[in-house]
């Protein structure tokens, strides 16, 4: 993706995320490495990044035992790759805003099917259901762009399955043949999340998340980081697929949110927020998104 040598020079804290990046299978789902402790961030015993509430770092397990709690479901942008300080993540900012803890349920390229499974397990096994859910579905699309492979029920191969999936198929299929299954997949599982929230009276906000590719005017540090410039043929294909189909994905998510009568919050198809790399927000960008999410969530609480 971006020129990480430049990024680490311009943003030294990113080194901590590179050095401590670890992906672990739980069943067929990738999570982050458990019990990571470093200056920039930490994870709990199941690999979820700690959230901060009233100055205390809390694990997912601790948060779901609270009298009142929220969940932020999503991919690595929710986890906060490159964003130093657990207190600066989406979940911590929403906790600060609403006065109760939010858990950081971020997975590597976390897709809506796997996030639905986590949500269902929390509702079924916890003493109380969450008081709020924010769902960021952008991982459905960004994961697809690695391989141009999608199944309408199961989605795209995870990051550790890419080589195997491409070998099975003899290479990447044309993305225009696979975008419809991808859109069917994201529609199915966003609806599933909305339906379970509605059936249990949980306020839900869908995030209209965005990437550097939709930014209208890059900042100086983003230009110096060479964001958006591919450095190998695989990235060239990935970035081209993203640019070609991001409007299709954005429009489908908007249609689904409208049909479900669920708020869709975020900057939309274009943005002017800050990025660490093409897919991860800096501190100001994260806060800007959370302001949008909070404005949509507040009337529901």
Can you annotate each of these PLM segments?
Residues 29-39, 83, 95-98, 210-212:
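Non-catalytic interaction surface on structured domains
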Residues 1-11, 63, 68-70, 77-81, ...:
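Short N-terminal signal/transit or membrane-insertion segments
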Residues 120-283, 287-301:
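Alpha-helical cap/lid subdomain in secreted, periplasmic
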Residues 1-70:
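N-terminal secretory targeting modules
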Residues 46-108, 113-125:
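Serine-esterase "nucleophile elbow" of acetyl-processing enzymes
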Residues 3-6, 20, 35, 86-88, ...:
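Detector for Asparagine
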Residues 34-41, 72-74, 100-105, 172-176, ...:
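A generic short-segment signal for beta-strand/edge and adjacent turn/coil regions
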Residues 34, 45, 52, 87, ...:
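Solvent-exposed, flexible loop/coil residues
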């Amino acid at each position: 993706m971006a020129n990480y040598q430049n990024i680490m020079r311009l943003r030294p804290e990113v080194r901590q995320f590179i050095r401590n990046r670890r992906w672990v299978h739980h069943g067929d789902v990738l999570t982050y490495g458990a019990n990571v402790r470093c200056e920039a961030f930490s994870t709990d015993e199941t690999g979820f990044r700690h959230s901060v509430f009233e100055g205390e770092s809390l694990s997912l397990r601790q948060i779901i035992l609270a009298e009142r709690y929220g969940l932020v479901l999503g991919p690595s942008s929710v986890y906060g790759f490159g964003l130093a300080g657990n207190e600066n993540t989406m979940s911590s900012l929403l906790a600060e805003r609403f006065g109760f803890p939010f858990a950081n349920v971020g997975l590597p390229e976390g897709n809506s099917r796997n996030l639905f499974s986590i949500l269902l397990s929390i509702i079924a096994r916890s003493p109380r259901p969450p008081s709020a859910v924010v769902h960021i579905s952008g991982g459905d699309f960004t994961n697809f762009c690695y391989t141009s492979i999608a199944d309408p029920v199961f989605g795209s191969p995870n990051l550790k399955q890419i080589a195997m999936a491409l070998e099975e198929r003899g290479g990447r299929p044309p993305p225009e043949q696979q975008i419809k299954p991808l859109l069917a997949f994201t529609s199915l599982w966003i609806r599933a999340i909305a339906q379970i929230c509605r059936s249990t009276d949980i306020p839900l906000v869908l995030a209209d998340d965005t990437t550097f590719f939709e930014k209208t005017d890059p900042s100086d540090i983003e230009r110096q980081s060479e964001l958006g410039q591919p450095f190998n043929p695989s990235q060239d294909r990935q970035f081209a697929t993203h640019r070609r189909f991001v409007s299709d994905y954005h429009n489908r998510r908007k249609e689904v949110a409208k049909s479900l009568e669920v708020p869709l919050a975020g900057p939309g198809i274009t943005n002017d927020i800050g990025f660490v790399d093409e897919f991860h927000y800096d501190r100001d960008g994260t806060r800007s998104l959370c302001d949008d999410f909070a404005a949509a969530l507040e009337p529901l609480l």
